[in-house]
């Protein structure tokens, strides 16, 4: 692997949107660095990217924890290469009426969808600003703009 290869970091590379984003970047020649809280769940995605001729690395990381985020970014930049593109794709919806929503659950959903986005984007942006290049992308759901029954915490995040 040469240092000239472009690296993408996809936070929240699950079985749907995040995984598809990682596959698309890999198809375009990026080294896909993908994360989930449980690294073992990334193996099917890594296998699929590699089978299609792409390069991929999986990392278990909790994006809500600043120390884990800092270590993740440092490891990727040191061992794989500079992160040229960053995609934040964490979201969680546990349907619940606003009347029954608990502060704890609301906070946990906000922590995953918002706070983790801040921590990870900040860590990557600090590197990108020094290099004067890079792209940061956030995915989102329409619940954030139009809400709906059972989406109080998810839409608020």
Residue map of PLM features:
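Active-site loop immediately N-terminal to the catalytic Tyr-X3-Lys motif
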Residues: 99, 146-152
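Conserved glycine-rich cofactor-binding loop
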Residues: 14-16
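Substrate-binding pocket helix/loop in short-chain dehydrogenase/reductase
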Residues: 97-98, 105-110
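Conserved glycine-rich Rossmann-like NAD(P)H-binding loop of the short-chain dehydrogenase/reductase
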Residues: 30-44
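Rossmann-fold cofactor-recognition segment
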Residues: 52-67
């Amino acid at each position: 692997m040469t240092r000239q290869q472009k690296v993408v970091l996809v936070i929240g590379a699950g079985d749907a949107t995040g995984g598809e984003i990682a596959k698309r970047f890999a198809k375009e020649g990026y080294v896909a660095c993908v994360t989930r809280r449980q690294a073992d769940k990334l193996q099917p995605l890594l296998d699929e990217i590699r089978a299609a001729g792409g390069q991929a690395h999986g990392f278990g990381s909790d994006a809500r924890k600043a120390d884990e985020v800092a270590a993740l970014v440092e490891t990727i930049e040191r061992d794989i290469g500079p992160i040229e593109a960053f995609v934040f794709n964490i979201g969680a919806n546990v349907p619940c009426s606003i009347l029954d929503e608990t502060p704890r659950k609301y906070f946990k959903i906000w922590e995953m969808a918002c706070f983790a986005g801040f921590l990870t984007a900040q860590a990557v942006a600090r590197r990108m600003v020094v290099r004067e290049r890079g792209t940061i992308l956030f995915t989102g759901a329409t619940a954030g703009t139009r809400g709906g029954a059972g989406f109080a915490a998810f839409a608020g995040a």
